[in-house]
Amino acid sequence: MLLSSLLLLALGYLLGSMPNGYLAGRWLKGIDLRQCGSGSTGATNVLRNVGKGPALVVFLLDVGKGALAVLLAKSFGLNDWVQVLAGLAALAGHIWPVWLGWKGGKAVATGLGMFLGLAWPVGLACLGLFMAVISLSRIVSLSSVVAAIGLPVLMLTSGGSSAYVAVSVVASLMVLWRHRSNIERLLAGTEPRIGEKGKS
């Protein structure tokens, strides 16, 4: 039990650390996304510097990383706490990938995948919240921040287990922390909208 749990946590980190956005930038444009735009390897920076198609593929792959880490833990019949730790390991791998000098993405897509795997109605509700905000504002970071803030509330009101509620708070804080510079620009009114160049 302990060994299988530890192996799943390690696998979760390795899954999360797969640098999909970085590889898209290198292979398709010959650029290092860590040196472009926001410096993030996530789908939004791919959208701004590589293109819509690659950004969609990166988004789906990043969602898959988070979902797979959780679903593997579930498939082995491990308890809720191991499941959420596997998901957090994937988030940590995405944010701090060992292959890229610990500089990765902002955990939004991978976090979405994680919660689709843990409690898909909550994951879909967060996605709906994200889409509603982005349709009104056309600001990805604002949509991410609102969805992150809403996540623990949605998990709590859905009757999620104590492990699920706890990890929703932790994941929300991780996403907000990764968006701290975006929040500063949002407050200053300088955050770019979709289609505009700039940091995000």
From Swiss-Prot:
SMART domains referenced in this protein's UniProt entry, alphabetically: G3P_acyltransf (SM01207)
Annotated metabolic or biological route of this protein: Lipid metabolism; phospholipid metabolism
A GO cellular-component term linked to this record: plasma membrane
Cited InterPro entries: G3P_acylTferase_PlsY
Entry EC number(s): 2.3.1.275
UniProt GO MF annotations: acyl-phosphate glycerol-3-phosphate acyltransferase activity
Transmembrane spans: 1-21, 53-73, 81-101, 114-134, 139-159
Broad enzyme group: transferase
Main localization category: membrane
Annotated family: Belongs to the PlsY family.
Cross-referenced HAMAP family: PlsY (MF_01043)
PANTHER family: GLYCEROL-3-PHOSPHATE ACYLTRANSFERASE-RELATED (PTHR30309:SF0), INNER MEMBRANE PROTEIN YGIH (PTHR30309)
Subunit annotation: Probably interacts with PlsX.
Function recorded in the entry: Catalyzes the transfer of an acyl group from acyl-phosphate (acyl-PO(4)) to glycerol-3-phosphate (G3P) to form lysophosphatidic acid (LPA). This enzyme utilizes acyl-phosphate as fatty acyl donor, but not acyl-CoA or acyl-ACP.
The protein's name in its UniProt record: Glycerol-3-phosphate acyltransferase
Source organism: Synechococcus sp. (strain CC9902)
